[in-house]
Amino acid sequence: MANVLVVDDSSTMREIVATFLGQNGFQVAVATDGRDGLMQLRADPGIRLVVSDVNMPNMDGLTMAEKIRTELGNTGVRIVMLTTEDNPQLRARGKAIGVTGWIVKPFRGEAVLGPFRKLCGM
């Protein structure tokens, strides 16, 4: 059972983030886009944190976040956007949807460990 879901259409970014988190004590699942991410969340009730890109095919990260909150009724899952988008309007939309955090790529892995552990209750 995973406690973190990494959602990114870039296989390289998925691998980097998932490997880093796995090496630091997280149980990680991965998804290729928002649609796949929703399927993973439905299948694994242990997920506590979703780390997602914004711009992805099929379903973007913000739409996925909105569906997590509305369709799945899941307010216990924390959602952090890990993206190159540093746009105030997108951040505001994310906050209104219920996105917990916004991290702009590139990022330092060590800087996210503490907050991610706290969000997962570790």
Describe the residue ranges of each PLM region.
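Charged docking surfaces used in two-component/phosphorelay signaling
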Residues: E15-Q23
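His-Asp phosphorelay/catalytic-motif detector in bacterial-type signaling
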Residues: G46-R48, G73-R78
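Acidic, metal-coordinating helix/loop segments flanking the phosphotransfer/catalytic sites
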Residues: V30-L49, A92
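C-terminal output helix
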Residues: F107-F116
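Active-site residues of response regulator receiver
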Residues: D53, T83
